[in-house]
């Protein structure tokens, strides 16, 4: 039976690590012994909320998903600090209410820039280094909205981008497979984060998923050996027929 991948000195990049799911992932992986490169637009907030993490095992770097140049700068800084890259967690994202009756073109453009183009750039820049790892991992945080359009309360723009993210994750799986790279789209339902504040139609607060639960799922995927690939991992907070 194949052993799972131990954290050892494996290096994981996590985008959007200053709040919500990203912060939970950072804290959980740090506790397991991973070396972390944490990216966020608000560097001051990132430094404050991750101050308790081991300083010798954590790099903090600016990553604004709307700024293409931040991608290469972050990758370069990660390699300069740790000398390797073993996993990428695409977590940074936004939710804007864009439907046929609400929102505007600028909001739709922001959704695509942050939720789709930014993780595409990160995967493209990280792939050569993940291939060299021999057991590279890409975990992209999608949504149950990646799998279906639930009802009229859902942001059409958001659902469109989350469907695209699922396609992106599957493409990454094919791109790196022969070199040991495995890609997983982790698809949480309503989670207790600021992202859902004031959004209609979501599961009420007490019934939402704890971000620490998502962090545990990410850690599980990162430890799986190459012969145990998980392409999609939906985690729902409500009863649905196919999710």
Question: Which residue ranges define each predicted feature?
Answer:
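Conserved glycine-rich Rossmann-like NAD(P)H-binding loop of the short-chain dehydrogenase/reductase
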Residues: 32-49
């Amino acid at each position: 039976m194949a052993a799972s991948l131990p954290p050892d000195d494996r290096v994981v990049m996590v985008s959007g690590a200053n709040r919500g799911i990203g912060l939970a992932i950072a804290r959980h992986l740090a506790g397991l012994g991973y070396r972390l490169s944490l990216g966020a637009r608000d560097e001051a907030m990132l430094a404050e909320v991750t101050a308790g993490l081991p300083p010798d095992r954590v790099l903090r770097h600016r990553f604004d998903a709307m700024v293409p140049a931040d991608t290469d700068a972050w990758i370069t800084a990660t390699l300069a600090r740790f000398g390797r890259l073993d996993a990428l967690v695409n977590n940074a994202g936004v939710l804007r209410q864009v439907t046929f009756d609400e929102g505007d073109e600028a909001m739709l453009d922001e959704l695509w820039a942050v939720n789709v183009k930014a993780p595409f750039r990160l995967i493209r820049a990280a792939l050569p280094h993940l291939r060299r790892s021999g057991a590279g991992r890409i975990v992209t945080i999608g949504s149950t909205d990646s799998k279906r359009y639930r009802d009229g309360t859902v942001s059409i723009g958001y659902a469109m981008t989350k469907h695209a993210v699922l396609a992106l994750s599957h493409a990454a799986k094919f791109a790196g497979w022969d070199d040991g790279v495995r890609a997983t789209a982790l698809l949480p339902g309503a989670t207790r984060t600021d992202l859902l504040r004031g959004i209609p139609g979501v599961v009420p607060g007490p019934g939402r998923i704890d971000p620490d639960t998502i962090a545990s799922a990410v850690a599980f995927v990162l430890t799986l050996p190459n012969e145990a690939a998980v392409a999609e991992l939906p985690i729902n907070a409500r009863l649905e027929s196919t999710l």
